[in-house]
Amino acid sequence: MIDSARVATVNIHQSLLPTYRGRHPLNWAIIKGETHTGVTIHHINEDFDEGNIILQKKVEILNNDNVMDVYWKATEVVCEMLYGFFDKAKKGNLKGFRQDPERATYFPPRIPKDGKIDWGESAENIYNLVRALTYPYPGAYFYYRRKKMLIEIAKPEKQGPLGSKIGVPTFYRGAFFVKTGSGFLKIAKLRNANLIEIKN
């Protein structure tokens, strides 16, 4: 395919390469607590996500953004970038520049079981996992009394109900709170394994 291309064989990758090479870069960026990611149009070569960079543009990640919020921001940026790409193509200016291997990071594909919550983590880290795995992804989940629970909307809190145990939901002031390794997670929307919302 690469050899048969008339002009160039390119890919649109949802990160600022060479960081976040690999699959699911938007999810990983949110999980890692990044405040921005980006979009890269780059050449395809024999190595995964390592071709010359033609164009890049930054995408902001707000603290309350979930993965679909960031996806739509990135999609808008792609549409804007394509004008510049086609302009470069018309001028025969698609060589781009080499990626810096010293800055490269790679992340593996994610699978549903990766969404299991470790309540020993900080509330902030768990919050990042929740917002990185919202619909249409499988979701961040935990088991309570042998039943699978999916967290759809949550936020970290410094304070919560006294006497709470790590990983055990407590109904407090109109919401479920779960004590974590550092702080509390306040759950605003919770579903069971059948995706039925659990009301407070």
PLM-predicted stretches and their roles:
Residues 33, 109-111, 133-134, 170:
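A short catalytic or substrate-binding loop motif that flags glycine-/basic-rich loops and adjacent residues
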Residues 1-106:
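Donor/substrate-binding cores of folate-linked one-carbon enzymes
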Residues 109-121:
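Acyl-group handling in specialized metabolite and lipid biosynthesis
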Residues 50, 105-109, 137, 150-151:
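Short acidic/glycine-rich loop or secondary-structure boundary segments that cap or lie
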Residues 120-200:
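An anion-binding loop in the catalytic cleft
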Residues 6, 113, 146-148:
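A generic structural signal for alpha->beta connector loops
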Residues 1-2, 45, 107-109, 141, ...:
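Short secondary-structure boundary/capping segments
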